[in-house]
Amino acid sequence: MSNTKKILVLIEEHFDETEYNVFNEFFPANGYEVHYSSFLWGNDSLSFEGNDKTAKVTVDLCISKVDLDDYKGMILIGGYAMDRLRYEPKLSSSTNQAPAVNLLRQAVTKMDAGKFCVGTICHSLWLFCADPGLLRGRSVTCAHNIYCDVVNAGGTVVQNNGETVEVHQDGLLITGRHPGAVHAFDKVFLAQLNQL
């Protein structure tokens, strides 16, 4: 593993541009390289456009080739990207075997061992919902739109006065409500990265 401090961000079509832009400014300004990864379907690279069509990213790092030991943490970007990444071309008989879900399982194992940070924001807990074993018993925050998905997958959504809280931390899992929380989310995520 190199001495360069790096974080991994999983991304796909329909990602949230606000988060994308803030990640690209905040983390490098605080000493971290940001690497984007997606499932490339056998291609050398793929380009993805954000929800509002104001940002585009070309990714050449396939999820199936990621070595999590190269990173201190991983963020699942918001928007609809994680819904796309949990897609399986053929349904498995047991648990979801999409490459992104398998990578998340590895990340959660490292996170639970106290060696890795995982962050989600807005709708990106959808990737956790693909395998309820990943979310069961954890407290999180998320977009109101996916509240039922998260609860049905075994998560406990933290609320205050009928709204999900802005940012919540459960061990090394940091969750943010929506893009409006991205600055607060980034600060909490960075603080945890720096303690590893």
Question: Where are the regions a protein language model picked out?
Answer:
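Active-site-adjacent pocket-lining segments in enzyme domains
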Residues: 3-35, 43, 55-196
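Membrane-interfacial amphipathic helices and adjacent loop/beta segments
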Residues: 43-51
